[in-house]
Swiss-Prot record:
It comes from the Bacteria. It comes from Cutibacterium acnes (strain DSM 16379 / KPA171202). One of its GO terms (molecular function) is L-cysteine desulfhydrase activity. GO terms for biological process: L-cysteine catabolic process to pyruvate. This is UPF0597 protein PPA0217. Belongs to the UPF0597 family.
Length: 354
């Protein structure tokens, strides 16, 4: 697609204005067998290299470390643009800052900061709620959100808080992954993580009828906790980060329905004993399933916490110290899943599809 269309100055929106004609030409290029896809043998967490051959010439572009970090552009081996390639395993300054925080500090910030400083988070609700609306009719992706809502209408699923969270979050992900021409407010660089950190909290806020300030603070807490929980993970790995975003959602839901730090702490601790460890097998329509499972887990963790209960620290990845549990999850995603990622790639490549 990038060889035929796109705006190189638009960052992650590089393909936002691609025409259907260009998309059809790209599909024809793939169908013709002109595109070869291989797995790069590199140590980088995120790496992509494209080489284009045409009329006896070739051009090369390489990305590493971040989705928009083009560190090398060349034509016929003549370097046109270059900058230092990020070292494998490099921890960006923002991630290092987040790793130095604690759940208690984040809670204190979200609940005491001047509300004007965090009003911007309402944009997350506006953008991601538009994705919910777009995905509710089932016209995008696998239509999971619409399927759940239809099950409610037919009496096959209950119309309760957790089911609504699950359905609406799935609908937004359906739209996001199914190509709806709408932006998402991201979290940790991911639209789906932004959806998980936003939609369950807004559903809870609508259910509880809380005032604007409580709503804003809950969204801010959710997104901040999601960033904190994700900070120990590589920029890309076999670890599905919808689960860390859901830790933020669980915190935000508790702030809506209870407000106390103890409730938030119990919910986040319980999340480390639930869906954490779910694998990422690449971006696709099935992300809606993982996203909705994570949202549902967040809702259940919040309800468990409101009953004064949590998963005890003697269980597996859970820890009595919630910050230690979060650090452990970062270690799991960084060290524990090193071999998982290449195995997933191998299974995908074995299908011989582009």
């Amino acid at each position: 697609m990038g060889a035929l269309a796109g705006n190189p100055d638009a960052g992650l929106a590089v393909l936002a204005d691609v025409s259907e004609d260009a998309a059809e030409k790209a599909r024809h290029l793939v169908d013709s067998g002109a595109v070869e896809l291989t797995v790069a043998d590199v140590d980088d967490d995120l790496y992509a290299e494209t080489v284009l051959h045409l009329d006896g010439h070739h051009a090369r572009a390489c990305i590493a470390g971040d989705h928009t970090n083009v560190f090398l552009v060349s034509r016929d081996d003549e370097v046109l643009e270059s900058k230092e390639r990020p070292a494998a395993g490099h921890v960006p300054p923002t991630a290092a800052l987040l790793q130095g925080l604690s759940l208690a500090k984040i809670y204190d910030f979200a609940t005491t900061v001047d509300i004007e400083r965090i009003e911007f988070i309402t944009e997350a609700e506006r953008l991601n709620s538009a994705l919910v609306d777009a995905g509710r009719d089932g016209s995008y992706g696998i239509g999971e959100g619409a399927a759940i809502l239809g099950s409610i209408d037919r009496g096959m699923a209950s119309d309760d808080l957790c089911t609504r969270m699950t359905a609406y979050t799935a609908a937004a992900s359906d739209a996001r992954m199914g190509g709806a021409p709408l932006p998402a407010m991201t979290n940790s660089g991911s639209g789906n993580q932004g959806i998980v950190a936003t939609v369950p909290v807004t559903v809870a806020a609508d259910y509880a009828g809380v005032d604007h300030e409580r709503r804003v603070r809950a969204l801010a807490l959710s997104h901040a906790v999601a960033l904190y929980a994700h900070a120990g993970l590589p920029v890309l790995s076999a670890f599905c980060a919808a689960t860390t975003a859901a830790m933020g959602a669980a915190a935000g839901i508790c702030l809506v329905l209870d407000g106390s730090y103890s409730a938030v702490e119990r919910a986040v601790a319980s999340m480390t004993g639930d869906v954490v460890g779910m694998v990422c097998d690449g971006a696709g329509c099935s992300c809606a399933l993982k996203v909705s499972a994570s949202a549902n887990a967040a809702g259940r963790a919040a309800l468990l916490s409101l009953a004064g209960r949590r998963v005890p620290g003697t269980n597996g990845l859970v820890h009595d110290d919630v910050d230690a549990a979060i650090r452990g999850i970062g270690r799991l995603g960084t060290e524990g899943m090193k071999q998982t990622d290449p195995e997933i790639l191998s299974l995908m490549m074995a299908k011989q599809t582009v």
